Amino acid sequence: MSSNNDLWLHLVSQLNTQQRAAALFDYTRGLQVIAGPGTGKTKVLTSRVAYLILHHHIHPRDIIVTTFTNKAANEMKERLQEMLRGAGVNISELLIGTFHSICLKILYRFGHLVDLQKDWRIIDEKEIDVILDDMIEKVPDQIRDYASSITRKVNLCMPSKNGDEWTIHPKLIKKQISKLKSNAILPEEYILDSNHDAALGYFYQIYQSELSKKNTLDFDDLLMYTFRLLTRVRVLSNIKHVLVDEFQDTNGIQLDLMFLFAKGNHHLSRGMTIVGDPDQSIYAFRNALAHNFLEMGRKCPIEYSTIILVENYRSSQKILNTSEILITQQNKGRQNRAPLRAQFDLDFPPVYMNFPAYFLEAPSLVRELLYLKALPNLFTFNDFAILVRQRRQIKRIESALIEHRIPYKIIRGHSFWDSKETRAMLNLLKLIFSPNDKHAILASLLYPARGLGPATGEKIKNALDTLATDVSCFQILKDISSKKIMLDIPTKGRSVIADFISMIENCQLLLQSTLLGGLSDLFDKLYELSGLKYEYLYKDGKKKNDQLEKSEPNLLNARHKNIELLKNYFLALLSKSESSDKEKNEAIKAATDEAEPIENKVITPKEYLRNFFNSLSLHSDAAEEEESESNKDAKIKREKNGFVTISTIHGAKGLEWPVVFIPGCEEGIIPCVFNDDKKDESEEDEEEDQENSKKDASPKKTRVLSVEDSIDEERRMFFVAQTRAKYLLYLSNTVTVEDVDRPRIASRFLTTDLIKAMSDSQKLFESTNSIKKLYRILNKKPPAEDDKLFSLDQLRKDYNQFIENRRERMIWQGIQMNDVYGIQLSRNKLLGSVSDFTSAADQLRLETQNSIFPQKKLIEKSRPSKINGNYAPKSRVKSPEKRYAPETTSFHSPTKKKVYAPQYVSTTNVPSRQEFHSSTGKNIPFLRREDRSITDISPRSSTRSLKGASPNKTSHMSDDLMRPSPTRKDKVTRNIHFATAGTFRIETQSNVDELHPPEYSNKSGQSLTSSEFSGFSSACSNSDQPTNLIEDINNELDLSDEELLNDISIERRRELLGSKKTKKIKPKTRNRKSKRGDKVKVEEVIDLKSEFEEDDSRNTTAAELLHNPDDTTVDNRPIISNAKFLADAAMKKTQKFSKKVKNEPASSQMDIFSQLSRAKKKSKLNNGEIIVID
């Protein structure tokens, strides 16, 4: 006995003041415990049960505990078992469960007292549907006419699917019968009511008669018959106390049942304890009554008291502050309580994000999530939840997660991977990879319909089950088609099987190639030849008698769009076709979580398919795996990394996550006043237990919700969603007023006070100290400052740049990432080496960040000054070191009058490294300068003056750093350096006036006159192809191949050059090449507009067209331009007969979001897509 007292004292010591008062309250009286979110209501309930058992010695079988779900009941049993361990208490005798499960146990024992026959059972939902359909089919005409008349009392009709005619619908009949049973009204009693509906009375009577014939009860009968039993007979005379969890979610008959449970053998109810929160009542569509707290006080036959719990153990104080501002907006029908108090606080408030276009919201949320996930050893994907008000919001979020390769799960919902079309396409791909999958064979044969019926499918299944022990399933199918295996299959069926086999074998041929490019064709062929494409574009939802041939393909079909999304996922890694093998392998490794490196390995199409199916394991239900050892290890690894949770707010009730995102905080979604919540939520958001699917209140207790009541319900739902968050909370919406047809307006709940309590970005990344504080609160260890792979400071900088760029692209290692597949979140420190395949912008940022010159800064953001719709920084700073870019002066951004596209010949206008070929066929590498101050590869580089096309123009060459010319901005000069024999480099520099003519030195340091290299200058300035350039040099110097490729002496060069006559070279003009006999001057100036005008400008990129290549400052802002400007920039001005492009007025918007909004408004009737070059 003393040991039990010690145990009880130990339990009490773990409670706070309010919790202790609730647990120790007089058990003979009534008690209301108002428990806000995170205040420990389950702890109070279990402690009170333990108090009744240990202190008052009440036997467990004399206590009833009701919960909202069976899952909650099982969790409570486990807690009590742990709390009372060693006390000698048998918790299994405790009567605990949902109202339906408790009523079921009572009726099993005492059902005969209300005329229930022996061996009755619960009827299946499918049986109910059959009964209802049969009733509707046989309904008399007068009842059918009455149901559709204006004199009806209850609506039982809905529009038919294939027309505008209104017909009696079984769903509405079932709903109305459920309401009658919830009020414990039998059919004969309802018919005697003077206000009854004739049609509903008819259906109710027939329905109940059919149940009696089958000796069955439905779930509503459980409550109704128990209520009738307890009002007649006191069968629960032993009950001494009743506890009800989630009291705010109870309806009228459940409140009455609570009083009947507690009555026991007494004329009045005995002890009752109810726990709940009126602010969390969100099941009005099931007619749960938030005012049941007040109703209990009105009906309670005994004295009762109220205790309010205010100590919150879940959320930070800033999250509680925002939720308190929200819930106190309700002025009527709510009892004020003390605000909740958190046990900790953080320096960063909840984040409110507003987007100008709906399609930007989901991807931006996912990128925010990735930055948080990147914090080492802090979060797993299990720590993130995205809560939606409506299920139609899930599609975009799911697509964004798939595109970013983030594993996810949907609580009690159907994910993209569960859809029929996705499963069908995956089955076909499985057969291409391994044709021995029996399930995939059967499913692909039967869907889409090809003339192979279920009976034939069953015969094929039996043959596969019987014969597949020694022979592959696909071979058995081939034997069936060729009649080697005799089955009673129609001729048409064999033809279908033969076509199916042919399709699989033909598509398998594409896997024999070593090239990955055929995978797109493979996907398209499977989609078309299988009949899925025709099914979704033409037949889906149409009858056979429709004229399918004349109809247009429905490209907006939801199933077809899902196939396109699957294809994008399937071909995601192929999008990096220009990447190195190393980059591809890293991307595959990141996508499939492969632990072993796969570098220097050529990936075949078959291996790509294997990696694709492995990557499906990112999604909790995307792939069905066998329980092999390797799969078990992979499963453990995936569970450790976790899954992002997607759930409706209803489904999230009672759960919590460290980080919560709530998208769609706008009118029409939150609040959603006129939505059919019953249709949207009830069937999928309830617990798997069927007994919870029928909780409708009685008509007497139910009133039609007014708009004000609906708004209060929506506010409570928003409150529940916010209080699921423990540390970080994000709210977001889309606000667009330009769309007149459907403007998007911020939620009315987002008042000025609420927005002031939030921030527009995550303040966690303002400083590394804030990040470390979060680590301390979560009892996690932050990465060391000298960590070789990860830097918190770099992550903070990337995130801030991400916010500055309006969350349009992920920024990683200071680089804007258009493709996030290859990002390794565990590594963000810049390494010394870079990939051979890189963009100019990436190379510039890398070299700038690694630069040893602190005075050279990278322009990350500046207020844009608009020039003809293009943007450039107002101020110019010294440019960073640049590896792959033209080296000329830095001027303004381009306008329509001046096109600064780099009009270099193909020898220099190539962004990646190229190789020139000598006459012997050997590779001669073309070298670019690593930076402006880099030295030549040779021990001594030679600097030479160029002679060229313009005899009246003069320029000088220098190895000094580029300096802007004060007068001649469009003039550039080129230096040609020899590194070794046969290896050379061309450099472009500003026109810089020198006091002395340049000198050239050989390896020995001897000076050369510029005239000695006149022939070489001619070759460089007049050649169009690299091979011609080498041949000209070779011919001009009169060197053999061997001499050219060997390290010849400078004396030999002088001798050869001295014997040559100086030749005059005429300026290069259109359609006429220079002749070798022309005279060459010592000095030359190359005019961008004269010499380079005839180059193939269509080989330039969009960035080169819209940004001045001479401007070496790095501008990270997106390119916005109209088609006219792009076309004019790419077109040669000298082409007189070119087709003109229709002019389009220059845009007047200042940023990308305004551009998108205006484009959307202008193309409101256009179903096409807006293309943005970024």
UniProtKB/Swiss-Prot annotation:
Residues 956-973 have a biased composition (Basic and acidic residues). It catalyses: Couples ATP hydrolysis with the unwinding of duplex DNA by translocating in the 3'-5' direction; ATP + H2O = ADP + phosphate + H(+). GO terms for biological process: DNA protection; DNA recombinase disassembly; DNA repair; double-strand break repair via nonhomologous end joining; meiosis I; negative regulation of DNA recombination; negative regulation of double-strand break repair via homologous recombination; recombinational repair. Gene3D superfamilies: 1.10.10.160, P-loop containing nucleotide triphosphate hydrolases, PCRA, domain 4. PROSITE patterns: UVRD_HELICASE_ATP_BIND, UVRD_HELICASE_CTER. Residues 317-654 form the UvrD-like helicase C-terminal domain. CDD domains: DEXQc_UvrD (cd17932), SF1_C_UvrD (cd18807), Srs2_C (cd22877). Its EC number is 5.6.2.4. It is found in: Nucleus. Keywords: ATP-binding, DNA damage, DNA repair, DNA-binding, Helicase, Hydrolase, Isomerase, Nucleotide-binding, Nucleus, Phosphoprotein. Residues 909-922, 935-955 have a biased composition (Polar residues). Residues 222-243 are annotated as: Leucine-zipper. Its main location: nucleus. It comes from the Eukaryota. Residues 1007-1023 have a biased composition (Low complexity). Residues 676-704, 865-896, 909-973, 994-1024 are annotated as: Disordered. It holds the Pfam family UvrD_C. One of its GO terms (cellular component) is nucleus. Residues 14-316 form the UvrD-like helicase ATP-binding domain. The modification Phosphoserine is found at S833. GO terms for molecular function: 3'-5' DNA helicase activity; ATP binding; ATP hydrolysis activity; DNA binding; enzyme activator activity. ATP binds at G38, T39, G40, K41, T42, K43, R314. Belongs to the helicase family. UvrD subfamily. ATP-dependent DNA helicase involved in DNA repair at least for UV-induced lesions. The polarity of the helicase activity was determined to be 3' to 5'. Present with 5190 molecules/cell in log phase SD medium. This is ATP-dependent DNA helicase SRS2. The gene is SRS2.
